[in-house]
Structures are given as structure tokens and as C-alpha cells.
Amino acid sequence: MNENDSNEIIEQLGISKRLGNSILDELNQRASETNPLLRKHEDTDNEEERPAESTPTAHNLVFNKVHNLNFENLTDKDPDFTIHNDPLHKKKYKYSPIKRVPEVNEITKKIRRLKLRSSSNLSSSGGSPEKRTTNASNVEQKTELAPLKTPNFLRPTFNSMNRAKDTSHKVESSRRTYGNLLPPTSRAIPAVKEAVRQDYTKRSISIQLPRKSPAPPKIPEQRSISDSSSNVFERLYKQTTMSRSNSMAFDQQNRKQLPKSRTITGLSSVVGDKHRTFPSKH
């Protein structure tokens, strides 16, 4: 290793020159010690390989002959390769890509197959074509709706049923007990009694109510044109409301003066006596 190389390495590593030189010297010594051994191994390897390469054995010769014969007699697996390279051959083979059916077409084919199966099943079962179409369209089988149940709040309870029985029993018992005690006139048919009562009420009402006398015809009032015009003028320009000042003055005019009480007159006389000045005595 040159000094320039060693200096560059030391500068790149950032080590002091003294330490770097000592390390590089040690590495050079070790390399010089190992070099002769490496050279000896390389020489021995080359000597062993050279005779095999230079002097071919009988086995290698036989192998090369067989290989050359087979290579010349080989037939190409792909004949298009030879046609493509042949200059006399006019037609050139074009590789056509493999046609793949799209997935959409496969789905449509499956749908058609299912429809054909369903139609074949319907035809085997029988029926008109209209029914077949309806059955094919209505895939979901509709279940019949159950009848609605009556709500619980409309059902009679045990208490209400017992009360109804009690009232009916009481009515029947009262009829049995008090029916024989009534006079024979009261045992008449209820429908006849009701008709008699209605006839009696109608007669009494017709006797009591006085007959209405026919009302005299109304005579339309004749108004002059001047009255109608004055009424319109009053309605337009008559003051319906009063201002606050006018209303206060109107109240003061209509206000009644109450008579003074005796206590007020007595107090005024007393106050006047106090403030009265008497003549001084000389």
C-alpha cells in the first residue's frame, strides 16, 4: 500500500496519523505473511485442472460424439419456429390469443337454464299458460292472512256478566211480586198505554197554546234625499271619540259639589282665630 493511499484512508476515517500508520503497517505485515501460502495453493489447483482440460479422456470423447449426433437429428417441438425462420415460406403464422368467454355471458346462460327448468316443471305439472307465468313470476308463496282477533277490551268480564245476571234477576222478581198487586186497569198492554198517553198530551197542548194572529204587513219608511245625505255626512264627519283634555273638562263641568261638613267649618274658624292679630296694650 502506498503512502498516499494510507493518508487518504486515515483522513476518511478521521484517526490520528500515528495510530493509523501503526495499524496499516501491522495489516501489511500480516498480508505479506499470508501471501506466499495463498500463492502455493493457487499453483497446485491450476496444475490439477490443466491436465484434465488439455488431455480429454475416452469418456469425454464418446459423450461429445453422441451429443452432436442427437443434436443434429433433433426435431423441433414447435414447427412454427422453423417456418418463421424460413425465408422461402411466404405465409407467416400468427399466434391467435385464446378466446375467453366473459363472466356476464355465463351468468345469463345460467339464468336461462333455470328458467327452462322451471318452465319444464310447470308443463309437467299441467295448467294454463297464464297460470304458469304467474307462478313463475310470483316466486314467494303468499300465506293466507289469519282472521283478526277481537280486542280484549270489548270482551265482557266476569264482574260485568255477574252484574247483568243480578239486574235481570231483580227485575223478574219485582215483576212477579208487584204484578198481582196492581189494579186491573194498570195491567193493560204497554203499547196501548203509550198511544193513549201521546194522544192526551197532543190534545192538552192544542187547547193550552193560543192561536197566533197573522202579523200586519210592514210598510216601508219613505225617507227624503236630504235626510239620507245628512245621515251620511254625520256618519263621516261626526266626532265619535273625545280627546283626553276635552273629556277631563267635560267631567269637571258635570262634577257635583258636595256640601261642606260641620267639622271643616269649625276647624277653619279655629285656625282663623289663631292667626288673628290683637291690638297691643300701651
Curated annotation (Swiss-Prot):
Residues 117-128 have a biased composition (Low complexity). This is Mitotic spindle-associated protein SHE1. Its main location: cytoplasm. Residues 28-58, 115-185, 207-229, 242-282 are annotated as: Disordered. The keyword Manganese does not apply. Belongs to the SHE1 family. Residues 163-175 have a biased composition (Basic and acidic residues). It holds the Pfam family Msap1. Signal peptide: none annotated. It is found in: Cytoplasm, Cytoskeleton; Cytoplasm, Cytoskeleton, Spindle. InterPro entries: She1. Keywords: Cell cycle, Cell division, Chromosome partition, Cytoplasm, Cytoskeleton, Mitosis. Disulfide bonds: none annotated. GO terms for cellular component: cellular bud neck; cytoplasm; nuclear microtubule; spindle. Residues 242-268 have a biased composition (Polar residues). One of its GO terms (molecular function) is microtubule binding. May have a role related to the spindle integrity, which is essential for proper chromosome segregation. One of its GO terms (biological process) is cell division.
